[in-house]
């Protein structure tokens, strides 16, 4: 079966910044440009397997030009838009690159706002910053084997924007968006010895732990990685199989690079010179007796399946919050009974195969998946092909682990965090001590209480650990004397008659083109994956061979016994206790964010696929979470250094103070509406300083300008005056101001909601709201004094002081 390509939707270039001062000028609609971008609503969970990707019903099969609204206006002949800098003639293409890297094309991320990359959120400075940021991202993607030096842009960026270049470059490097990976030019920048006094203990050498450790070493930290297994990689495990003079490498864990657009693991693969094999769309299905499925019946049932998924989306929209307490499985079964149009056994078997595929995509039973949020990560799909990596994903793991200090067979059972550091206790009682720790153990281990935290984790984090689901996928890998299956396909499927066994060997992966030998992999999903945990390996292999012989022997093809076979048991593996996470009934995407939160005043951090709301249950999600936490650890370390300096004099470290400010506002002294306040000085002094934070949500201001007075400015203005965020989501912005305690209390008493408070703040009090950097150095001392006061108030209740350092490991 062949599949249609993912839909592409041309978006009109809608207005953003700045507003148009000439609202009565109307452009010629025929000349209105459009931007063709991948449709983010493409059903990710239906294609995560890397094959049989289908359009949802009613989706366009080809791009359709969409003109901008007639109300869109051309730009003024002279306006603030003329201050937009010109870097090149391809800002639209660079915006698309930013989108694939996880950035909004025309706005800032929360992390950028918190880092204070611009002093005026929403102005021309932000527009120019985004142009520079997108250009840096694009250049990095083009030159990933080289170190991207800031100096190479000195002649390209106007002098008045040097500070924006510095801010963008610093942010992208520190957050792992550029200059990461394993290219020689990147590795030679890693310091031979630590340049910082901070010690970080990383628990777990999976992709998250390796990504974080590698970054932290590059940033100059002292790092040690504690791994319970005898190998690195965690749930990414490439097994070398041998027998009869044959050998092959099979991925028993994470196996598919899901999407190549912007995937950082794709960058690492390219740095290693590894070709990526696109998983071909052809996926024939076979009935329980081994005969091929009728193509027309297959087409009909697949259409019914997609129709019911679409109807389930409409159903949850109509149910509102009630959908949080309903499973996807219950919704699909109800819809099938009322509108399923499945009349024969073959049609029901085919439908159950699609359900098994859906359970594979989520590593969870449909009866456990949340109807409301099971696909909450779909808008962030990387896009692009799904691929196998020749030789297995273990090649990525080995490259990332190179020169990273890893101590194997160290099973962590206790993590303590105190006022001055952390202690990590491993099997045998050995204690590792450091300044900070990063926990990357799988959600299954956290659910089972495999690691004890002292003090106990906050209740909100414990609740999220309990709410999120952690499912199971198992495999049977078989090395044969020769390839007897078709060489023009990478996948084929098999139907079962018993619905409770629908996930049993329902899908086969052919690794013959990428493993170096005749390797075939049978997948076990859903309820069958749990039953498989106790199935004797010989019985499992016999069942697989029976299926294969039922398919191929009627065609006159002999199926030999395998030379070697391996059965996985991820559910009972004590270091994983499952495969990957999903949003269970009662949970939401918020729970991923909560799992990612640090605890212990920035001493204990968390990473892993179950800590990323956008990319859960993926290898690249785990990798990205490690880069994220390396950045967070660095920010907190800088904040502590800044605090130490502030006690002697005000700090000029902007990012460090930004991190301090972010921490302080986690527990504001005063909250009302979208406003929160932290107080400094004496409570009895009405003139004592305070810092106000305002959360601005909802749609951004929309100007109506378009076009340009010069060709070289044309695309820049169109992009940043008209392009809406690709994800079409409302962005929350945070702005700040310094004021007195008395003014803050007056503001709280203003009636009429946030709009009236904003009016009072700006018009009556004459206060200007700015980004973090706009607060200026005067705020740094206030921030530091508030932090010092809070630390002082906690002194009596803090755990005892811990020694810093890493003991010599016992061999």
Swiss-Prot record:
Residues 44-55 have a biased composition (Basic residues). It comes from the Eukaryota. FAD binds at residues 227, 229, 235, 609. Residues 88-189 form the SWIRM domain. Coiled coil: none annotated. Its cofactor is FAD. Residues 56-71 have a biased composition (Low complexity). Residues 1-79, 790-811 are annotated as: Disordered. Residues 1-10 have a biased composition (Pro residues). One of its GO terms (molecular function) is spermine oxidase activity. GO terms for biological process: chromatin organization; spermine catabolic process; thermospermine catabolic process. This is Lysine-specific histone demethylase 1 homolog 3. It comes from Oryza sativa subsp. indica (Rice).
């Amino acid at each position: 079966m062949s599949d249609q390509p993912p839909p592409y939707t041309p978006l009109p270039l809608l207005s953003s910044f700045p507003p148009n001062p000439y609202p009565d000028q109307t452009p010629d609609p025929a000349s209105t440009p459009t931007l063709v971008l991948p449709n983010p609503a493409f059903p990710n969970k239906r294609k995560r397997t890397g094959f049989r990707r289908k359009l949802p019903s009613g989706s366009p099969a080809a791009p359709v030009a969409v003109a901008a609204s007639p109300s869109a206006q051309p730009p003024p002949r002279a306006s603030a838009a003329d201050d937009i800098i010109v870097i090149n003639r391809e800002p639209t293409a660079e915006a698309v690159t930013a989108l694939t890297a996880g950035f909004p094309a025309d706005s800032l991320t929360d992390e950028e706002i918190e880092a204070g990359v611009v002093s005026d959120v929403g102005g021309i400075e932000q527009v120019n910053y985004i142009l520079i940021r997108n250009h840096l991202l694009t250049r990095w993607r083009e030159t990933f084997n080289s170190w991207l030096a800031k100096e190479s842009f000195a002649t390209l960026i106007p002098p008045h924007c040097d500070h924006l270049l510095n801010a963008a470059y610093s942010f992208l490097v520190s957050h792992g968006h550029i200059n990461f990976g394993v290219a020689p030019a990147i590795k030679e920048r890693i310091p031979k010895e630590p340049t910082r006094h901070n010690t970080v203990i990383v628990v777990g050498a999976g992709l998250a732990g390796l990504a974080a450790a590698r970054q932290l070493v590059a940033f100059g930290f002292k790092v040690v990685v504690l791994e319970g297994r005898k190998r690195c990689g965690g749930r990414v495990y490439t097994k070398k199989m041998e027998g009869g003079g044959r050998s092959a490498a099979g991925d028993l864990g994470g196996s598919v690079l899901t999407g190549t657009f912007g995937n950082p693991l794709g960058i690492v693969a390219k740095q290693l010179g590894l070709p990526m094999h696109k998983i071909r769309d052809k996926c024939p299905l076979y009935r329980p007796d081994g005969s091929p499925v009728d193509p027309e019946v297959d087409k009909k049932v697949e259409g019914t399946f997609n129709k019911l998924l679409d109807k389930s989306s409409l159903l949850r929209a109509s149910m509102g919050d009630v959908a949080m307490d309903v499973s996807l499985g219950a919704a699909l079964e109800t819809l099938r009974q009322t509108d399923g149009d499945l009349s024969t056994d073959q049609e029901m078997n085919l439908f159950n195969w699609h359900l098994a595929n859906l359970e594979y995509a989520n590593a969870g039973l449909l009866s456990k998946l949340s109807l409301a949020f099971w696909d909450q990560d779909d808008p962030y799909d990387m896009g692009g092909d799904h691929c196998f990596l020749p030789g297995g994903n273990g090649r990525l793991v080995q490259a990332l682990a190179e020169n990273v200090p890893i101590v194997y067979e160290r099973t962590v059972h206790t993590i303590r965090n105190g006022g001055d550091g952390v202690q990590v206790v491993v099997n045998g009682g050995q204690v590792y001590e450091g300044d900070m720790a990063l926990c990357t153990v799988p959600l299954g281990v956290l659910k089972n209480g495999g690691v004890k935290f002292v003090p106990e984790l906050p209740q909100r984090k414990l609740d999220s650990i309990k709410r999120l689901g952690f499912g199971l996928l198992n495999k049977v890998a078989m090395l044969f004397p020769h390839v007897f299956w078709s060489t023009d396909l990478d996948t084929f499927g098999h139907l079962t008659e018993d619905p409770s066994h629908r996930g049993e060997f329902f899908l086969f992966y052919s690794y013959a083109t990428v493993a170096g030998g005749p390797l075939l992999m049978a997948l076990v999903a859903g309820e069958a994956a749990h039953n498989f945990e106790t199935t004797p390996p010989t019985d499992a292999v016999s069942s697989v061979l029976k299926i294969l012989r039922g398919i191929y022997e009627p065609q006159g093809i002999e199926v030999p016994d395998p030379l070697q076979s391996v059965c996985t048991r991820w559910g009972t593996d004590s270091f994983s206790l499952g495969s990957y996470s999903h949003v269970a009934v009662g949970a939401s995407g918020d729970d991923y964010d909560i799992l990612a939160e640090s605890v212990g005043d920035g001493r204990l951090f968390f990473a892993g696929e179950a800590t990323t709301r956008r990319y859960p249950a993926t290898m690249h999600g785990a990798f990205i979470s490690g880069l994220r936490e390396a950045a967070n650890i660095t920010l907190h370390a800088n904040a502590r250094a800044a605090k130490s300096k502030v006690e002697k004099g005000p700090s000029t470290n902007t990012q460090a103070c930004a991190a301090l400010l972010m921490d302080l506002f986690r527990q504001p002294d005063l909250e009302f509406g979208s406003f929160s306040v932290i107080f400094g000085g004496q409570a009895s002094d009405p003139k004592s300083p305070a810092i106000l934070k305002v959360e601005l949500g909802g749609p951004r201001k929309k100007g109506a300008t378009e076009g340009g007075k010069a060709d070289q400015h044309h695309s820049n203005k169109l992009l940043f005056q008209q392009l809406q965020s690709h994800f079409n989501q409302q962005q929350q912005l945070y702005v700040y101001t310094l004021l007195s305690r008395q003014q803050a209390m007056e503001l709280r008493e203003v009636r009429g909601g946030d709009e009236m408070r904003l009016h009072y703040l700006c018009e009556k009090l004459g206060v200007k709201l700015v980004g973090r950097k706009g607060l200026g150095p005067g705020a740094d001392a206030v921030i530091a004094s508030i932090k010092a006061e809070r630390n002082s108030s906690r002194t009596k209740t803090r755990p005892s002081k811990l020694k810093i350092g890493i003991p010599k490991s016992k061999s």
